[in-house]
């Protein structure tokens, strides 16, 4: 699981181009979007990117909040990995943010990490 400075996060005012840099730098295929209090308000994924490219939205002027998945699926630290895997399979997503009870991000992981850990 990625934590701390490895956690892919952008501010709600970030441009899409900035979110793409965060996705590329952190290598998880998504980034969380947080408000000014550090609360997760959405997730921007490579799937969101494909949709905005199809809609011909300008990556350098659009903000990530205009195109993100609002809310997004999350898990909590105490949830079992197999339960998180079931959530991912049910919703056909490949990565999850881990949040505390106030929806502040504390970690993130993807299917590859679960496979490497022997959960799959």
Feature locations, PLM:
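Tandem CBS (Bateman) regulatory domains
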Residues: 1-6, 40-94, 101-120
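Short loop/turn microsegments at loop-to-beta-strand junctions
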Residues: 28-29, 93-95
């Amino acid at each position: 699981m990625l934590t701390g400075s490895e956690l892919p996060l952008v501010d709600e005012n970030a441009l899409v181009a900035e979110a793409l840099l965060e996705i590329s730098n952190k290598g998880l295929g998504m980034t969380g979007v947080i408000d000014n209090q550090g609360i997760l308000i959405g997730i921007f994924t490579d799937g969101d990117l494909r949709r905005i490219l199809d809609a011909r939205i300008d990556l350098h002027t659009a903000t990530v909040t205009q195109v993100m998945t609002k809310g997004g699926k999350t898990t909590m630290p105490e949830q079992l990995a197999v339960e998180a895997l079931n959530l991912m399979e049910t919703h056909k997503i490949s990565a999850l943010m881990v949040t505390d009870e106030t929806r502040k991000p504390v970690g993130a992981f993807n299917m590859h990490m679960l496979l490497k850990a022997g959960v799959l």
